[in-house]
């Protein structure tokens, strides 16, 4: 396994779901340095536009820098073109940025998702700029195998955002139980045509109480 892969696939679980009425994205909060838990409140999900979010796996410093740059670029796009950017446009911009640094890559794997004039979508982007549109579910990071097991068992194309939020929380929670590099709470957002909503820790706890053993 390369140094880049080790940096990316240790210390994070993120998931994204494309639902019939929106997009749901979730992460856990643990940041690690080898076997050391460096933070129990790491931010791994960012609002980068009105109805758009980005999740990050990998280097915290690289992720924070990219989140700032992409948010600025999204604002500039809207000012220059006098219309809101699409998810595809921001994913392409991010892909081009990462590819331009492919010989000295940012140690991140990203999910960018939301709702725009073209509909709802999520893109996964690798450290050297490869971008793939995910049609239904996606998981990244060290706990992704466990998360995929939960998502694939319960996801349907007709799932709504509220049910998908519970599924995303369940998937992250399952990964946290099996992956020592994931843990310490869950952040989850739902994005619909009407709102960008981030659930509070208390609301997440209420969801967890439904299936926690």
Swiss-Prot record:
The active site is at residue 12. It catalyses: Cleavage of peptide bonds with very broad specificity. The keyword Hydrolase applies. Belongs to the peptidase T1B family. The 20S proteasome core is composed of 14 alpha and 14 beta subunits that assemble into four stacked heptameric rings, resulting in a barrel-shaped structure. The two inner rings, each composed of seven catalytic beta subunits, are sandwiched by two outer rings, each composed of seven alpha subunits. The catalytic chamber with the active sites is on the inside of the barrel. Has probably a gated structure, the ends of the cylinder being occluded by the N-termini of the alpha-subunits. Is likely capped at one or both ends by the proteasome regulatory ATPase, PAN. NCBIfam families: arc_protsome_B. This is Proteasome subunit beta. The gene is psmB.
